[in-house]
A protein has these predicted regions:
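Extracellular/luminal Protease-associated
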Residues: 37-51
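Short hydrophobic alpha-helical runs that function as membrane-insertion/retention elements
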Residues: 43-45, 65-71
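A short acidic, amphipathic alpha-helical/loop segment
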Residues: 55-59
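Switch/connector loops and helix/strand junctions flanking conserved nucleotide-binding motifs
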Residues: 52-54, 76-80
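Core catalytic machinery and nucleic-acid-binding channels of phosphodiester-processing enzymes
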Residues: 83
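Active-site helix-to-loop segments that bind/position phosphate- or nucleotide-bearing substrates
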Residues: 1-19, 28, 35, 62, ...
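NTP/phosphate- and nucleic-acid-binding module
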Residues: 24
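Short, acidic/turn-prone active-site loops that include or flank metal/cofactor-
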Residues: 49, 72-75
């Protein structure tokens, strides 16, 4: 029996139960998977028609093993955690108060800057493979990478305003401006991505909901997997994933998760999907325009490998999954006022 740390179940009709010290996945009379609980770190249910017993849920929550639910197109719709993972009162009070103080704005700006820097870096990284084969495309990608950094400067200028320096500026005062800056950077990023990807995929540009093309479908599914890891990191750091800053609070909307995920999208998902595409991964779709089960499993495997890969961070090498947890704790300490700044993850390839 191999060691399973991240259990994914996506077969219609599958049933997850607990037996002794293991989770057992069966479909009818066929035993599909046995996962020893001692090694298990998370459970991902990624299709409809999958059932799980109350005993399995209880055992997972008692052991601190989160259970995530995403649809077959990658849209997350539920998570189960231990009732004890609700964070400290001090951390959550500081988080709620930060929405009305300069602290929340400082966090939003840092995350936004980190996201754009990573987008710029990824375009630059992808361009180097075109230097000899397509010099014109190489120059175009380099230009777009530089233009994204111009938007970083635009974001940084907000911190030079007198009202920011005095501490009186609030997120609500500049929310639309920040979203506009990020949107203009995203336009350049996806314009570059479209030129990087093989034409046979027919990438139309970024489509979030209702995507029917293979690249957007793969990205959305990958983001759904990443979403669960991000939410888990925030909960373990004592933060409320539903109380964000840039994304407006709405019932059932995990706005802090949506804020925090931004600096990791290019690093954890985009690079993986673009790399797979440039190696001619078929990203097969079914008759309804959705990713096939086999394609979803391959994407999940590649995203998991990426999360387990090490990258430089704070002078050492850490698995990307661990860095997410470290960064979530940095967010918590920053909001509590124990750190003067929050430094986003910035990848150098």
């Amino acid at each position: 029996m191999g060691m399973i740390q991240y259990l994914q179940v996506d077969q219609y009709g599958a049933f997850i139960s607990k037996h002794s010290e293991r989770l057992i996945v069966v479909k009818g009379k066929e035993k599909l998977i046995q996962a020893p609980l001692i090694h298990l770190e998370s459970v991902l249910i990624s299709n409809h028609g999958v059932s799980i017993s109350s005993d399995a849920i209880q055992e997972c929550t008692e052991r601190g093993i989160p259970i995530y639910f995403i649809s077959h197109n990658g849209a997350p719709y539920a998570s189960l955690y231990s009732a004890g993972l609700t964070g400290t009162v001090i951390t959550r009070r500081a988080q709620y108060e930060a929405l009305q103080t300069i602290q929340g704005l400082r966090l939003v700006l840092s995350i936004g800057i980190g996201k754009m820097q990573n987008q710029s870096t990824l375009l630059k990284y992808m361009s180097k493979y075109r230097k000899g084969t397509d010099p014109t495309l190489f120059q175009e990608l380099r230009l777009l990478s530089t233009e994204i950094l111009d938007h970083v400067i635009e974001m940084e200028k907000i911190t030079q305003r007198p009202e920011y320096q005095s501490g009186s500026l609030r997120i609500a005062d500049v929310r639309e401006e920040i979203l506009g800056i990020e949107g203009r950077a995203a336009q350049k990023y996806w314009r570059g991505v479209k030129q990087i990807l093989p034409e046979r995929y027919g990438f139309p540009g970024r489509v979030r909901k209702g995507a029917k093309d293979p690249i957007n479908s793969a990205l959305n599914y990958g983001y759904g997997i990443l979403y669960g890891q991000i939410e888990r990191s925030l909960v373990l750091a004592g933060l409320d994933p539903f109380a964000g800053f840039l994304h407006v609070d709405r019932p059932g909307k995990p706005s802090l998760t949506l804020d925090f995920i931004e600096e990791f999208r290019p690093v954890a998902v985009d690079r993986v999907i673009f790399g797979m595409a440039n190696k001619n991964m078929p990203f097969e779709l079914d008759g309804e325009g959705l990713l096939t089960r086999e394609t979803r499993l391959i994407i999940a495997e590649k995203i998991t490998e990426r999360l387990e890969s090490t990258v430089p961070f704070e002078g050492k090498q850490y698995p990307l999954r661990n860095i997410m947890q470290m960064q979530a704790r940095h967010v918590a300490t920053f909001l509590r006022g124990e750190k003067e700044t929050y430094t986003p993850l910035q990848i150098r390839w």
